[in-house]
Each structure stands twice: as C-alpha cells, then as structure tokens.
Amino acid sequence: MALDPGHIGPNNDPMRWGPAAVLACAAAVAFPAADATGSASQKPLTLRLAQALAVPHVLPAQSAAFAFDLTTGAAVFERNTALSLAPASNEKLAVTYAALTNLGPDYQIETDTLGQGQLVGTTWRGSLVLQGHGDPTLSQTGLAQLARQVRATGIRRVSGSVLGDESYFDSRRTAPGWKSSFYINDSAPLSALTVDRTWFHTHHSQAPSAAAASLFKDALRKQGVTVTGPALRGIANPDAQPLGAVLSPPLSQIVRFMDRESDNFTAELLLKQLGAADGAVGTSARGAAQVRATLNEAGIPLAGVRIVDGSGLSQLDRLTARAIVGILQAAWNQPELKPSFVAALAVAGRSGTLKDRLRGAPARGVVLAKTGTTAIASALSGFVRKRYAFSVLQNGHPVSSWWARRAQDRFATVLASQ
C-alpha cells in the first residue's frame, strides 16, 4: 500500500506527525562489523560494565542491568535482574513481541465502508458506516480512497447519515494508571476509529469516531457523493453491506514507527488490537492479558512483571531486566519475527530516539535499542551487533534522566567495544 508522507498535518505538532513518512523510508537494519582499530581494555568486562553504571543521582537499589551473550548463551553482567521496576517505554518491547507473535509481521488492519439500506438508481436509501478496527495510520488519504470506492458502486446520493463505528474497541480514551497530563500531551484519545490521529480541523477530537464520520462525509462530497444526513457516532447493523475497504501498512512497518519514535498512541491501539484478537471487544486489560500470556508461552520469567498499558506511560507497569532480555532473546531466536523486531529498534547515532545519542565509535550504528523516559523511570534495552542483548532500567522519584542516560550509554558503549 502506498504511503503518503504528508497526510497527517503540520510538522510542528508531534502528536499530529504520523508514521507514514517514517514507514515509507525505513530500511532493513544491518549490523556493522566491530571496529578493528579499537583496543579492548585490560579490565574484566564485568568490572567495566559496573563502572559504566556508577553515576551520581541514580540509586543502585532502584536500578537493574543485565547483559547476555547471544553467541555463548551466558550472562556477562547481572545486577538486580529480578527487581520489579517501572519500564517507561521499554514496555513497548513486550507489545511489539506479542503483536508480531500473535498477528504476524504481514498483518494489516482493515477499515471498512458499509451500507445500511439499498441502492435505488443512484441514491443509497439509508446510511453509510465507516467502521474502524484500530488502524493508527488511517488518514484522509485513506478516506478519499474509500469515497472513490463508494462512488464506483454507482452511488451519487445518500439519503441517510454517515456513521462512525468504533465498537471494535471499548470507548476508554486513556489507559489505566495514566496521569491526566498524559491524555493531553502524550497520546491522542484512544479509539478503534481515528483519522489523522484524531486531529480534527484545529484540535484533537474528544469524539474520534464522530470526527472520522464528518471527515468521511467531506471526502464523499469531494468525490461527488452528496450525504443528506449528519455525521454521527453509531454501530453498523449485522446485515450491513460491504462497499469498500482500505488496509494499513504491514504490522512490521507499524511497530518500526512505534518503537523507533516511541509512539504512545500506536502502542495503545496495538494493545487493544491484541485484546480484540479472539473476537471480543478490544480493551487494554484484554490486550495486557494477551501480552502476558504470550510472554509466558515463550518461557519469559514473569515474576515482578505487570502489564497494564501498551506504551509504558502507566504508573502501574512493571518489568524486570531479566524479562526484557528474555523478550529480546525470544525474538532473536525466532527467524520469522527477528527481522521485523530488530528493524523496529532505533539505531545509535542514526535513527529514532537514538539519533542524537551514542554518536561516536564504537557504539554508533552497532547499538540497536529501545529507549524509555518518564518522570520516574529511564531505560535502554536492545542489541549490540549480533553478540549481546542487554537491558538497563533505572527508577527514582524523580529519576535523573541526564545521569541515567549517561550510564546507559556508557554501558552500551562498553559492550560495543568488545
């Protein structure tokens, strides 16, 4: 499916900046070879990693670190690996693994147009329904495509309304354990039917499905289809007739945007997508249960793990360094998931949330990781070349993000120097 890099809106609002531009240009990640000119320190690796973590304003008792050699199957550093800590956006690693496992890298999310009524001549006597299934990338470009499909059926006039159906998910606009400020600043309102990440004219709509219906009515008008009735929130009848559909990009591209840019909105919709996988209404709680079940099936230790939301914004989320490294190992060892999982991570000094970190040798380009930052947590977890999986989690009230990141970067750099 072709992606339109300009459909979301002005670039000066990060909540409006959609994934399309990132998805369209993302490329497969290669692991560069080690720097042959670098000389390894004579100090034991364990000591150098411990020294890397020794920074002020970060409490060792509220920190954890784990480094694992993927080639030997041995741990090379362990500190508080079973300590239950707030993971910040490292929570997205669990959602990424569960989504790729349960849905598959090629999975696409469908948005449908349905007709309630019948076509008489060129008039649809009844209403049209725009039915969402949680596509975080749906844009006005997609609505235009749906409108063209409606016109292609011969419809030129709709006597009823345009309904926005978001019933595939529940109607909770936030996830459990969020501060009220997160709803305003860190994620658009959650819904199974959103267009342009709920941006509607000049603001984020608090009624996403009704806003989507209104935008679809406009799209129909531009295609020469007149709708007599209003745009409203509604639910499709069981006997509604399919009139068209558009698909999201593949899941592999969606998680690439989500993890590289640490996008909270996408993570929360994917969590609800997992909750709806068994035919039930998608909720954060059902999605969280599916994530936990998936981790358990992979043999990942769940003591100290609590999955509440998809993004890591919830103050109730907890992970351990051992569980995160377990997720990394599980993804690494599954050939059908590994390329998509690894490619989703930011590349040190080059892309995503690591573009301006770890820019020097030997870490640049060889550390692939997921960052995480909230007021109480900082984290960095991922891979170093094809050799190490690692996780560093640090908590505090508040945590010093500057010093925490310094420790994380030093830890990853030591591994990259091996």
Where are these regions (language model features)?
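Beta-lactamase-like hydrolase cores
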Residues: A26-F31, D35-S84, L146-G154
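Short, well-structured active-site flanking segments
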Residues: T101-Q116, G224-L232, K338-V342
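Extracytoplasmic
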Residues: P60-Q62, N80-A82, A88-E91, G104-Q108, ...
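A small/polar active-site loop signature that marks catalytic segments
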Residues: W199-S340
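Soluble periplasmic/extracytoplasmic beta-strand elements of cell-envelope proteins
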Residues: A64-F68, V76-E78, V95, D112-L114, ...
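Small-residue-rich helix-loop
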Residues: V76-E78, G275-Q418
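Active-site SXXK
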Residues: G73, P87-P105, V162, L193, ...
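Active-site-adjacent, His/Asp/Glu-enriched structural segments that form or flank metal-binding
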Residues: P105, I109-F169, Y183-N185, S191-V195
